[in-house]
Amino acid sequence: MVSATAAPGCLLEQKPVSKSLSDVTYHNQIARLLQRHCVECHREGGVGPFALDTYEDAVAHAPMIREVVDRGIMPPWFAVADKSHSTSPWINDRSLSASEKQQLFAWIGNKTPAGDPKQSPVPRSFADGWLIGKPDAVFEFAKPVKVKATGTMPYQNVVVDTHLEKDQWVQAIEVRPGNPGVVHHVLVFIQSADKEDGPRDDAADERSGYWGIYVPGNSTLVYPEGYAKQIPKGARLRFQMHYTPNGTATEDSTRIGLVFAKEEPKHEVRVAGVVNAGFRIPPGADNHQVVASIPSVPTDIQILAFLPHMHLRGKAARYDLISGGETRTMLDIPRYDFNWQLLYRYAEPVSVKAGDTLRFTAWYDNSSGNPANPDPNKEVKWGPQTQDEMHLGYVEYIVPGSKPGDPNPLSPRGRARGAIRNFFGGSGSPEPNVGDALFQKLDADGDGNISRDEVKAKYNNNPAASTTIFDRLDTDKNGQLNRKELRRLSEIIGR
């Protein structure tokens, strides 16, 4: 369990509401409203603490519903509305419109009339509990993971064999914890069939991206026709599990369900992380800003979705696109909630041109005024546990004109390749080995080792060079790169 500085929340009080809209009943309006915004979680077997899919359920929880809706706690949705558009740009926007709130408050204020059952919508159904429908394949842990009663647990990495006999294109993914009460989040990565305990694949690090995901508020990835992710023949799935003990020793066996595309897609869906892993948040800082970017995107892309990820001190987040000297805010979250790490999916993909910059900015509250802060007297840096912090701006995207299976331009490998090209001012290194060529350029003091500061000095416009890429090359973790370690760059960029 993670301690908080103070107990968050306040007493619930009933507020008087207008008794206008007296014709609003459960069956003619409220049932539909709850189906659209609430029932996906608040149903039997859902992640919500109680169901809201019947009249009796809605009436029993009416005072609480009004309070949490009025305070903006529910439904969980934190993006600022784009006032330049009449409709939300987000296809999964859970927020209630002003008219929907009026209807809900009027119904509760008028003593929750039931109305005519004939006007009620058809109840939503969920196939065998799977939100994505019946999966074509389900993979589960070979044996449960034991979760202790108290304290913290390091991330558990569980590898599951798929035994797939051919490459598959996947149109829908759902991660289902066996014990949701102790699973805070899950990241799933693809691991090649020939890798056991050796170096992880390019994506097997939360800083690089994810293949599948389970976080509070999001357990599915569903793509329209023509869009899919690939899982290779014989691949393994690496589940990175973040468990949060809840006072009782227990165990968990998580599953993942996949729905295969009927044919090869037109677009391969990819994920990149906009990351700053080198930040330090001072003790007591109540609005500490951290910035990361992908400068000069190497090729045209279309963004499908964003998923910002921070921990308990996360306060606010924003994605910006810098193009032609102008800055455009793409997603603004002034009130970030660690308990609801939501995916924000565009109704229509948004184009980003080669040379544009994607920037992810986050603000952190490490003060005693943050009731969820475990320790306001501590300097905080990057780390895997909840009491540590992260600065991760995930971007889900496609590359127009590329073929499924082509190299990923925003992966660490793709970005390293682009950084090397830019560094040499051309299409690549003139040397047989990129690492040897770089060593000569980076070893400014001639001591035979490359420090993080030396890399930062040469790549000051590319934070990934001195963080993500540096860490991947520093195999002995001594904070220095020797010539042998830097030669591994040839493997990373495919030279």
Which sequence ranges carry the predicted segments?
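Bacterial N-terminal signal peptides
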Residues: M1-A6
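Conserved hydrophobic/aromatic "anchor" residues
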Residues: Y26-H27, W107, F439, F470, ...
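Primarily EF-hand calcium-binding motifs
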Residues: P432-G446, S466-N478
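Amphipathic regulatory helices of Ca2+-sensor modules
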Residues: N449-P463, R483-G494
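Extracellular/periplasmic ectodomains of large secreted or surface enzymes and adhesion receptors
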Residues: V395-V434, Q440-L442, R495
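His-enriched metal-coordination microenvironments in redox/metal-binding proteins
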Residues: D128-K403
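Aromatic- and Gly/Pro-enriched helix-to-coil junctions and flexible linker segments
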Residues: P8-V160, L164, A172, R176, ...
